[in-house]
Amino acid sequence: MTNKIGAVFAAALVWLMAAAVPVWGHHGSAAFDAGKQVAMKGTVTQWTWANPHCFLSYDVKDDSGNVTHWVVETSNPPDMINRGWSKGMFKPGDEVSVTVEPVKNGKPVGRLLDVVLPNGKTMHSASPARGPAN
């Protein structure tokens, strides 16, 4: 009887461990257009300071007055703190200059590389993704 209980327990443990594997997953950078950089000026609408990534949302107005809403990601808060960033560094309405690595599909989404704050200070978020090694 105890062998049967042990076998059931072992099977349940293996099943739970297998079911938990997706929790350890993380998205890659295949969606980003590696090496491409786009610079723009915009108005901050929201700064989201949260795990697993922080997000900067901002509006960019083109020469015709059309507004495009961008959302770009950075790293996690602890990493951003190490880079000198903070939870309260952006306020809605802040005018910023942003350099992003956009996604390949052309949507207004990307990885934030650099931002020039309203006070003129440049903050670096990340290095652009690199292509495969030769």
Predicted regions and their residues:
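Bacterial N-terminal signal peptides
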Residues: F9-P22
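Short boundary/loop segments of OB/S1/cold-shock single-stranded nucleic-acid-binding domains
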Residues: W24-V38
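Conserved hydrophobic positions within beta-strands
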Residues: G42-V44
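Short, structured beta-strand/loop micro-motifs enriched in basic residues and often containing a Trp
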Residues: T74-N82
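Short nucleic-acid-contacting surface segments enriched for D/E, G, S/T with interspersed K/R
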Residues: N82-S97
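OB-fold/S1-family single-stranded nucleic acid-binding modules
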Residues: V103-A126
